[in-house]
Amino acid sequence: MGSAESKISFRHAILASLNTKPEREIYEFLFTCNLTENDVFSFILAQDIRICRDSNKFDNLAILLQVCVLNIVSIQNKFSEQYPLKKNALLNSFLILTRLLPYLYESTNSSNWVRTYFQKDFSQTVDDLKPLLSELGLNYEIELPNSFSNLTSLLSSTFQLCFQHEFTVSKYASSEESIWSAGIAIPEIAHPPSYDHRLHQSLLSCFLVVLLSNTLYDSIDELDFSVLNSIVSLDAKDIYIRVICSFVNTGFIDSTNWFLNSFNQRRNSLQLYSSWFIILILSDARIKENTHLYANGEGQHIKNHLLELFKKLHRTQDFLIIAESINKFLSNPLKKERQIITFMGDFKRCVVESLCFLFLLLTNQPRFTDELVNFKSSNEMMMNLLFIHVKYSGDTENSYMSSLAGYCLQQLVSHEKLVKAACHIDKSLISPSPSSQFPVFDTSVAIYVIQVLCTLENPSSIEYNIISNILFSIPTIPLKNASPIVELISYVMKPEFFMKSQQNASDCKKLLSSFLYFLINNFNDNLHIIELLQKDKRKFEPIIAWSETEFSEFFVTSNISQSALDNGLVDQAGLDEQKWYEKWFHDLNIPLLRKCLTLRTDKNPFIEQPDEPNVTKKIYRVTYTDALQRWNLVNIWRHIFKETVTLNSGISCPWYGTNVKLFTVREVRQPTILQSRSLGEFQGRLFS
């Protein structure tokens, strides 16, 4: 929007539409003026939306929203006839909806109204509004199936517009080229989108993420997935294919210079919102509808058809393109730490997005991990993941990023061929600067991962899983510096560790089992480890000397008082825990460890006495459970919210200032045009 007079007119029109009976002149101006994102965020104030939403003037807000939806559906329905004549009506409708929806989701009453409206039949809605629309000079002739709801109609039209010639893709683009960016499925686009097309793509990707953001205003136990369910259950296979290719390519793969440097902010917005949308869609492997909407409180599981289609991605070259692009982002923190290159802006930009996408690929795309065997930079990817996981493990602000890197690394080393590839020494790899966290890198990546993780303070289950996977899968190779892992094993075998929780006990068991498995299968190359164990065998007391009966007695005396035993006050939970620990001790392979501490090192007794108890190989993979999905969803939204509120690029945050319920929000300032001193003075003079 250009002149000050136009800004004043738009501000007055918005106030009139919210506070007075709808008038033709007001609506005509709202949907014909030239609006920008900053105009909408600056002149449709949060307090105005809330006042209207929470008063008897809510109907005005509801009418404005419904007209925006009708504009989008009707213009898309007859695009060739109405575009570009009604271009501003289409763009302004998306902009206004993007601004209004978070505040409607924020309130329980208005959120319920939106949900009811979305589920209502579209044709019926048009019929109900005809008298009012006639007064406003709005006439809609839309051809849609009678069964379409308002939300389905809106989503269908939005997705159609995402790949509409002349709006988001070039009018010269072939059917195969009607996606946003080159990458998977199509390596090159002969007629790439123009500057305006990119603007429209950015607008639509932002709107789709905002549409999904209703879960931001739900408690963690009562998440409403109605919008998401509608998105993933559309009968639109061709559209889904374009959505996957466009949003994946734009968010993670296409690194070409679309425009001049002055357009970097818009490019950044498009890239981020594209990556966020595809991540949010693919994150929900087991979608469950809001339970409190049903009388029995159980809800209904709905299949994610878009994810199912994504799982059918099968071309090796596509997987390798994705892996290469993700790894470029993941390498930024380590390169920055080593100061190999100079970064403009935040070097962590898109690292979380890439980690989350990689995590979803490794857990929900069956073929991706197998295809990484053909990825020449798999060792580099492991090193990057290790650095991110360890470097930011103690940083509360980056705990999600650290955990994602750990899960991804665990999944990579659950593949035996990738572990074997990681055993080859490659000193050309960029490694972390030597520090208390990272020793000098003079070995293979697989051994280096073990060295680093074994020296962490208070390792988590992720670290134990990673170490165990490597030890179970590593080929015959000497472990030169065994002190860190011996120290770690002696630590986890202390009663104060394994008695603290069953999870700790499980971590102790998996670490000891994998270590013994490694020794048995690499005995001749690792005699120095046997010698080290024997030298430090006192570190494994008292557990190494206990029989099963002695362990049971220890458990009882440590956890159950004598008076409780005498009076029969031990509850079933206590008895169950005792049985669990007794079985745990029985399966702990103490006899094998005891043998390692006493045997001669001049021959391999495990070969000569095959009847001795052996260790069963077990690989610990990441399973995308409901709990992990919920954790991921909450953290994705927390990251999106933080990025849009604090991002230096100036991307406006649609949710800024709203009362989010999904997680705790720290007070931050929005670095957008709203912080401009001149604009603040301008608003103060005109709108106070």
From Swiss-Prot:
GO terms for cellular component: cytosol; Golgi medial cisterna; Golgi trans cisterna; membrane; nucleus. Pfam families: Hid1. It comes from the Eukaryota. Keywords: Cytoplasm, Nucleus. It is found in: Cytoplasm; Nucleus. InterPro entries: Hid-1/Ecm30. Transmembrane segments: none annotated. Belongs to the hid-1 family. This is Hid-1 family protein P19A11.07c. It comes from Schizosaccharomyces pombe (strain 972 / ATCC 24843).
